[in-house]
Amino acid sequence: MTALEKIRAWIATFPGFDILGHFYVDYADHADPGNGGVFPTGLVEVERREDILGNTTVTNQYNFGIYCVLAKADGDDVGASINADWVSDIQEWVQEQSITGVAPTFGNTDDREIVRAQNGALYDTGEGTATYMVQLSVQFKKFYEVI
């Protein structure tokens, strides 16, 4: 299973996910409330360490944007509060999943992986919609043995 497939399947287990009728890759319909998407932004090599034998441990980080288009009318403070709570809830859920060790794993070492959902914010508004974005990152280690 690819990193994208893992993230997509895992996000679908969020208890509040049912608010999204569709969850796309690299797309979110900003005119239709109740959908979202995951936008992969790549892999970053954070650190590389080599031992005297040439074996290498790499700390990597995958980054994703999670976009959600939710219903919100102009001046609708109640709807805005519900949406903001949803954004906070998914961030707290990701944190809990990471801390309790039930988030998906990507590395091949016994080191604990860290998944973070951060900076959830209103991204854009449209006719009866509001698009929110959360930055998701996964930090993990991979070990490469020289044979």
Feature annotation, model-predicted:
Residues 1-28, 46-147:
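Charged, amphipathic alpha-helical segments and their flanking helix caps
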Residues 33-43:
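A short, hydrophobic beta-strand-centered structural micro-motif
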